[in-house]
Amino acid sequence: MDIRLSRPCVEDPTRYIAECHFGKKVAMEKLCDLLRKIDAKELKCSLKLGVARFELEGRSVMIYQSGRVDIRRIRTTDEARNVMVQLINMVKDALNDTSS
């Protein structure tokens, strides 16, 4: 799992934006349905743009159809890795078997 802390968050310079990747493409319709079912906080889903945005434990998460994931308000790569494991468990049914 490739994780990079790319740049400081605008609202809190002590936290970063983590750029990650599932390693698989995302079926956006399934993803949006899954996130609605679990009542993801502040969910915004766009099938047309191929992106879902929601809040998870005080972090802003963006999942793209390509499999890219941006997590805002992260302190360390270990924290980002833990969030990614949580995300994979939440949305595994929306991940396609074909790699991106």
Where do the protein language model's features map onto the residues?
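Short, compact, well-ordered microdomains
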Residues: 59-95
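Short Lys/Arg-enriched alpha/beta "domain-start" segment
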Residues: 1-45
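Aromatic-residue detector
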Residues: 9, 39, 44, 53, ...
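Flexible, glycine/charged-enriched surface loops at secondary-structure junctions
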Residues: 45, 97-99
